[in-house]
Amino acid sequence: MTKVLLGFMGVGKTTVSKHLSMHCKDMDAIIEAKIGMSIAAFFEQHGEIAFRTIENQVLKDLLFANDNSVIVTGGGVVVLQENRQLLRKNHQHNILLVASFETLYQRLKHDKKSQRPLFLKYSKEAFYEFYQQRMVFYEGLSDLVIRVDHRTPEEVANIIEGY
């Protein structure tokens, strides 16, 4: 069965996936290859709704492949109800990576390489509310929750591989 990594933006899903011996499929990388530009540029030019439509199709394709890989999702994959339904069908194989809000906020604030449109849009207080809303979805879909605040990516990868 395909495992799915879930978690808020900046939690380290892509970083952890680089330490897994299992075959990983990074949805953001797949989407960027498909659209021919960065996700940030696509958001700016076409908006979030257009992006979520593409994200939904990529998630469907990857889940239906059912090839025992690890799907590394983007932080907003839980926004669409259809995506949440797809993820519920993957029951017992959804893994949530969790970090404290302050850890995530500092990571995103200092990440000059990957400017995330939804992070740049909010004040810290509004971003916290956004974070709390998303966490409700993640927690409702997750079968294994891994706190990453005080773990290395290698340690997190070992937990995932043992699951």
From Swiss-Prot:
Belongs to the shikimate kinase family. HAMAP family: Shikimate_kinase. One of its GO terms (molecular function) is magnesium ion binding. It is an enzyme of class 2 (transferase). Its EC number is 2.7.1.71. Keywords: Amino-acid biosynthesis, Aromatic amino acid biosynthesis, ATP-binding, Cytoplasm, Kinase, Magnesium, Metal-binding, Nucleotide-binding, Transferase. Pathway: Metabolic intermediate biosynthesis; chorismate biosynthesis; chorismate from D-erythrose 4-phosphate and phosphoenolpyruvate: step 5/7. The gene is aroK. It comes from the Bacteria. InterPro entries: P-loop_NTPase (IPR027417), Shikimate/glucono_kinase (IPR031322), Shikimate_kinase/TSH1 (IPR000623). It is found in: Cytoplasm. It catalyses: shikimate + ATP = 3-phosphoshikimate + ADP + H(+). The keyword Flavoprotein does not apply. This is Shikimate kinase. Catalyzes the specific phosphorylation of the 3-hydroxyl group of shikimic acid using ATP as a cosubstrate. Monomer. One of its GO terms (biological process) is amino acid biosynthetic process. Its cofactor is Mg(2+). Mg(2+) binds at T14. It comes from Streptococcus pyogenes serotype M5 (strain Manfredo). GO terms for cellular component: cytosol. Substrate binds at D28, R52, G75, R134. Binds 1 Mg(2+) ion per subunit. ATP binds at G10, V11, G12, K13, T14, T15, R116, R151.
